[in-house]
Amino acid sequence: MAATTMSLSSSSFAGKAVKNLPSSALIGDARVNMRKTAAKAKQVSSSSPWYGSDRVLYLGPLSGEPPSYLTGEFPGDYGWDTAGLSADPETFAKNRELEVIHCRWAMLGALGCVFPELLARNGVKFGEAGWFKAGSQIFSDGGLDYLGNPSLVHAQSLLAIWACQVVLMGAVEGYRIAGGPLGEIVDPLYPGGSFDPLGLAERPQAFAELKVKEIKNGRLAMFSMFGFFVQAIVTGKGPLEDLADHIADPVNNNAWLIATNFVPGK
């Protein structure tokens, strides 16, 4: 590294002398440039109808001309931004990252809300299968048992759970943002580089389609989670229990009647 730096500082490259810079500056600039180049390289053009100027828009042929800054480069871009939230590139990059991360959490959360109820309806014993009541089991005398089995995971300390969450999630987020032990950031949002166990980035066209599927399902999951929150507040039941009640008696168990008869605090 020292020999390389000395040769660069004392010779010319492409007819222009290279300025004498400290090795730390060269290394720092190289790291930044490598990350920027890698990030740009991940934006793969696709012949898919979900990318480019001819992509599917939010109202189809009635959508009109999308804003100039929405070029169809990223997954989930339907050319709709009436509030101008994506006009500033830095704000757009930040919001895009937040949306993708929230989409993933919402998909996991929606599965976590429905799956325990589904298992409970098929004979698996839980202390509490309702997603919004399950956490309160930690305050019971017996504590919180995973899948109702104390030999799997048994928790009685809220502080211990909080500490584990902070440590584990902090490690995962740190790995995602910093690029892991190798310090390689190809794209902090998607697999690639040092972390791509399924080899998704090796198939650019298929990977581009998967990104669209992820963002579409993630947006639906965020709406689903909002619906689960409202259901829990209004009916005090989980999503599958509410669905079963509606199927059994759709006339008296529907969103309109429940909403109009809802009294906060009762």
Swiss-Prot record:
Protein biosynthesis keyword on record: no
Positions where N2-acetylarginine occurs in the chain: 35
Gene label: WHAB1.6
Keywords from the UniProt entry: Acetylation, Chlorophyll, Chloroplast, Chromophore, Magnesium, Membrane, Metal-binding, Phosphoprotein, Photosynthesis, Photosystem I, Photosystem II, Plastid, Thylakoid, Transit peptide, Transmembrane, Transmembrane helix
Gene3D superfamilies in alphabetical order: Chlorophyll a/b binding protein domain (1.10.3460.10)
Subcellular location: Plastid, Chloroplast thylakoid membrane
Protein's name according to its UniProt entry: Chlorophyll a-b binding protein, chloroplastic
InterPro entries: Chloro_AB-bd_pln, Chloroa_b-bind
Range annotated as the organelle transit peptide: 1-34
One annotated Gene Ontology cellular component of this protein: chloroplast thylakoid membrane
One biological process term in Gene Ontology: photosynthesis, light harvesting in photosystem I
Subunit structure: The LHC complex consists of chlorophyll a-b binding proteins.
Positions contributing to chlorophyll b 5 binding: 165, 262
GO MF annotation terms: chlorophyll binding; metal ion binding
Residues involved in chlorophyll a 4 binding: 217
Binding site residues for chlorophyll a 1: 80, 86, 99, 219
Pfam families xrefs: Chloroa_b-bind
Cofactor note: Binds at least 14 chlorophylls (8 Chl-a and 6 Chl-b) and carotenoids such as lutein and neoxanthin.
Amino acids binding chlorophyll b 3: 157, 173
Positions annotated to bind chlorophyll a 5: 213, 231
